[in-house]
Amino acid sequence: MLVARSGCSRTLIRMGNDENLMVMVDVEEGEIPDSVNTEIEVKHKSTTTTADVGGDVDVGVVAGGRGGGGGGSNGNSRVWTMEELISQYPAYRPYANSGLSNLAWARAVQNKPFNEGLVMDYEPRESDKIVIEDSDDEKEEGELEEGEIDLVDNASDDNLVEKDTESVVLISADKVEDDRILKERDLEKKVKLIRGVLESTSLVEAQTGFEGVCSRILGALESLRELVSDNDDFPKRDTLVQLSFASLQTINYVFCSMNNISKERNKETMSRLLTLVNDHFSQFLSFNQKNEIETMNQDLSRSAIAVFAGTSSEENVNQMTQPSNGDSFLAKKLTSESTHRGAAYLRSRLPMLPLLDLHKDHDADSLPSPTRETTPSLPVNGRHTMVRPGFPVGRESQTTEGAKVYSYESDARKAVSTYQQKFGLNSVFKTDDLPSPTPSGEPNDGNGDVGGEVSSSVVKSSNPGSHLIYGQDVPLPSNFNSRSMPVANSVSSTVPPHHLSIHAISAPTASDQTVKPSAKSRDPRLRLAKPDAANVTIYSYSSGDARNLSKVELSADLVNPRKQKAADEFLIDGPAWKRQKSDTDAPKAAGTGGWLEDTESSGLLKLESKPRLIENGVTSMTSSVMPTSAVSVSQKVRTASTDTASLQSLLKDIAVNPTMLLNLLKMGERQKVPEKAIQKPMDPRRAAQLPGSSVQPGVSTPLSIPASNALAANSLNSGVLQDSSQNAPAAESGSIRMKPRDPRRILHGSTLQRTDSSMEKQTKVNDPSTLGTLTMKGKAEDLETPPQLDPRQNISQNGTSKMKISGELLSGKTPDFSTQFTKNLKSIADMVVVSQQLGNPPASMHSVQLKTERDVKHNPSNPNAQDEDVSVSAASVTAAAGPTRSMNSWGDVEHLFEGYDDIQRVAIQRERVRRLEEQNKMFASQKLSLVLDIDHTLLNSAKFNEVESRHEEILRKKEEQDREKPYRHLFRFLHMGMWTKLRPGIWNFLEKASKLYELHLYTMGNKLYATEMAKLLDPKGVLFNGRVISKGDDGDPLDGDERVPKSKDLEGVMGMESSVVIIDDSVRVWPQHKMNLIAVERYLYFPCSRRQFGLLGPSLLELDRDEVPEEGTLASSLAVIEKIHQNFFSHTSLDEVDVRNILASEQRKILAGCRIVFSRIIPVGEAKPHLHPLWQTAEQFGAVCTTQVDEHVTHVVTNSLGTDKVNWALTRGRFVVHPGWVEASAFLYQRANENLYAINP
């Protein structure tokens, strides 16, 4: 019943928005007007009513003046529910919300909640009208007075309610069915959209547009999360979850291949993806998939920790406040989730690392250095941590290892406010002790760093469980000088070797060692004010201590060879007074990389019995083969006897340690400058021709090295020789002094070499310093003397005599280790065989046999040459045949050796000769070399545990059917636990290719896997003939592509590189031989193999399809290698033909004449679009790529329609193709059909 409010004499009653429903009614205050007998009737033409979803009807009837029974209203009255009133007439809602008795009564009768009726939608209809009729008649029987309720049952009303109820029930059932159908359609539509996004994720697209792909996947996963939460189970749920996991694998693969900058930019997105999948879909994943996600999270956390540790304090502060901004940003984005789904997810929970120490006073020496690598963020063991005085050390910090993980604060303000409570203490991380920005002039600054630089590592205490108090120095040993110690920090024999090798440091023995001396003592200007500070104390070592020290020093060199380089250069420069040494105060620069020092420490030379020469802090031998260039007096020296094979072992060690050679090379270059100021040096390239050009192979040449008796006595008594720099103060003043890291050193070094060359050219050929004495024993013949050599040096031309080389040394003069000698030490090591005799000085001469393969070939007819001796002066052995071998041996291939030293040239030449012999044999049989990759090229393998049970049954049936065929393709290896499927057409390919090529099998798997596959493909052993190469170890997985990617090379492959063809599915594993490679499409038969490479969609096994043998990949590859073979042997001169040129020519024919423009493939504004893989592939196969359309463009390669370039191509009838068209053309070595890859509008 609608009643006008009291207090209104004339009230405008308007219900709904229909203008026809507005009438004027006169009412008295507080009552329904009797004079005008107003009744409200509801007239409608429809006989049905609208009910809510539940089918319930409110029985509250709007009563009229006659109870709805008179006035022609029979049949037109309807039952009004509160839902209809609320939805149809908004003005009525306040009354319903206030708890109107009609609504309360209706709900009480039906035992329903009050608020259930507020959710019904009502559609307004034209037929529903409210008409107010005025009547002058008196009140009829049954008419209600004000405040009364009609309790008399009206039969007509009851019948009306009963009919309406039945109608509502029928309509409600139909509506429920419609809603169910709509819900199913909506669900199916959402599933289809999600699946489309997940299936469209490809590896190439992720590499080109990582952020866009991640955004789409985030949106799809959010929608999938809602579906999973709203529906307990729905079709395709498991499929969508598996697709989500496959997409995550693809994204993770691309993320792991990024550089550090890209990882830092995309780590948030990656973390959100991992968290979303792990939190909401892990219950639908298998155990292995969960483990893989956990591994992804751990890798991401480790990379995040490393990035956090390397950031500056300001960056860390920004990262601390970032979650706060992220929360506010998230709150805004939650309201517009439909426009940007990915932004509504929570940020990743990365561990927060401490910033710079809040209590530490940082000075210039403790700030990070831009020239040093970032200090490691990994914590040290609690036993060696540093604590601040006054703060307790917890038991947990003393016993636990690993990074200290702080709980993540979800509230940004709370996280910032509690920061000082967390990180107020000194951190347990090693980064507390920050490195110095510049290299210290005092190598021993407390950190024991190798190379004269300040290390960021904390010195481990020799007392387990003890803590070093930061800011307090520990007492040093009495014999320890923090400012005058040598670079490698002389180590006492009591220091455990492992204690030093762990940190690549060496320090004096003490129960606790100093952390860092005062900053004042590290001032480099103090060295100028106190020249005596450069003196250092030499410690005595036993042979065992020397060996242990060598191990520590070598490990330090391996840790940071860059520091070693700086240290050596630092010791070389400087004035003479700074490098003065006395007999009792001679430096022992242990571990500076000198080859003599290292070999002696390893036991080849004894310290007690071998006199040493000190030159700029680096030790050398008094009995060196290389004397100075100013030798004029021949004197004999009694040298201490050593083991018979010491020199041979020494040279071999030199050959395998290039660091030693590099250090000696630098020393020789630096020493030549002051010496040439007062002496005329002998041209090392002239003297180098003696052993390289005149000593023939198979010749044993005893090399005696006599030295001065006085020199021997001096060295035996004191063990130290005076530095040659003391005898040349004038030359020292002319040397250029530069800091160790001064980049002008490189320019200066090249200037010295050019100056040396010009000076050597001006040297007279009859200089007395270049003369030597020659004596012959046995048969003597004249050698061919180069024009540069003194004609008075009577040397045998055929080189079949032995040479006895007498070393001539000046007393107190250090031998000149020239550049050419150090560059050719490996050549000498290959030619030298040492035999020493103990006894008198004449019997203790060093016998050196010089051998070369070239000389063996030139003089095979002199078997008695070993009985002949030739002695020449030591000045003629200053260099070991390097330049002469380059000029006389390399010949027309000299250009191939540019950039290699003579050590590498010898090895390359030896390998080259061997390969040329193999190649000539192949050419004689009209064959080339063919390298075949196994995995995903010739076959596809899968382990038993990777194959699903439903696929297992299919494979078993196929294998039974395959056994009846003459050539099988499917195998089940029980002993290896794996399935193997051969690529269609492989038997025909191997049979025909073996007639044209020497076949080689190559795999990244282990030997067991390679052997089994070779037996499978070549049961008789006639195709490969044992040429099987495996790069993996025994502990590696069977399928090599699951391992960490490695590179492949042609080691073990017959012939030269110019005659080798490679067939592989991966280009990146052949970085040095891409020009020899025929790239083929991966053969992925098993579903697990597709997932390994992040590919979506069903596999060949699931599709029950396979490649066509006559048109597949192997058939196309066979046609290519047959063409290469035909073109190769059509040339008359096979030595000038290269398969790489033939292959490149065949590739350029594939897409010749095509002009390609890429649309939505290469990011807009890319500075170097030609580096995109598709761009490079298209140009490699003959196409011309451009960034702008023109009339010559023939193809537009795109992923979608709608761009200007695509519209331009469609209007002009040009090809609009998918990127797969380029890939297909490259794989099949023929232009693919554009219609198969067309993108139609």
From Swiss-Prot:
All copies of domain BRCT, residue ranges: 1146-1239
Gene source species: Arabidopsis thaliana
Protein name as annotated: RNA polymerase II C-terminal domain phosphatase-like 3
Predominant place of localization: nucleus
Compositionally skewed regions (Basic and acidic residues) per UniProt: 677-686
UniProt signal peptide: none
Keywords: Hydrolase, Metal-binding, Nucleus, Plant defense, Repressor, RNA-binding, Transcription, Transcription regulation
PROSITE patterns from the UniProt entry: BRCT, FCP1
Origin: domain of life: Eukaryota
Induction trigger: By NaCl.
Gene encoding the protein: CPL3
Catalytic reaction list: O-phospho-L-seryl-[protein] + H2O = L-seryl-[protein] + phosphate; O-phospho-L-threonyl-[protein] + H2O = L-threonyl-[protein] + phosphate
Stretches for region Disordered: 361-402, 428-470, 505-525, 578-598, 677-702, 720-800, 852-885
FCP1 homology domain segment(s): 923-1103
Bias kind Low complexity: ranges: 441-466, 871-881
Function according to Swiss-Prot or TrEMBL: Completely dephosphorylates 'Ser-2', and partially 'Ser-5' and 'Ser-7' of the heptad repeats YSPTSPS in the C-terminal domain (CTD) of the largest RNA polymerase II subunit (RPB1). Involved in defense response. Acts as a negative regulator of immune gene expression and immunity to pathogen infections. Preferentially dephosphorylates 'Ser-2' of RNA polymerase II CTD. This counterregulates the MAP kinase (MAPK) or cyclin-dependent kinase C (CDKC)-mediated phosphorylation of CTD in response to pathogens and upon perception of microbe-associated molecular patterns (MAMPs).
